[in-house]
Amino acid sequence: DKTTLSFVKVTENYLNQVYQTYADEVKRRNENDGKIIIPNVIIKGKTENFHFQNVEVTAHNLRAEMFQPDVITAIDTILSLGEAGLLSYDLQWYESIGTAGLVKSYWVERINQDKSEGRCGFVYEAGDELFRFFKGNHNHIPSDIRVINSPAYLEYFWICI
């Protein structure tokens, strides 16, 4: 499906930081008896902002054709918050988006009253504070296939491209 891989040379120190981030996530998950509890979930919408703390995320098996049962992905955070009655949401399946010829993923279309429109909508990132924004956590893996371990934070934010 026209996949491109890029390789970037990084320092040993950077690799050690990435490894430590993963080790911290494993430790956090173990300390929570195998549950994924995200210390900070942030939602910055067009009209509303939310900050939830210590959110337990459970598997919803949205992509059962892709993953084994009970694999937890980033989108499960939104589904778990909705299940807890803390927000409402809509998901939308996209075969493609704009010039991205092949997407085939669910996207968060709406959180409460903030609904995607035109070239504006929600994107997300998850990981350690050390790699916030474009330092590594913000990537282009759809949230329904981004497997999470136990990130320090997960953020959905509104963007117009």
Where are these regions (language model features)?
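Ubiquitin-like/PB1-type beta-grasp interaction modules and other compact soluble beta-rich domains
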Residues: D1-I161
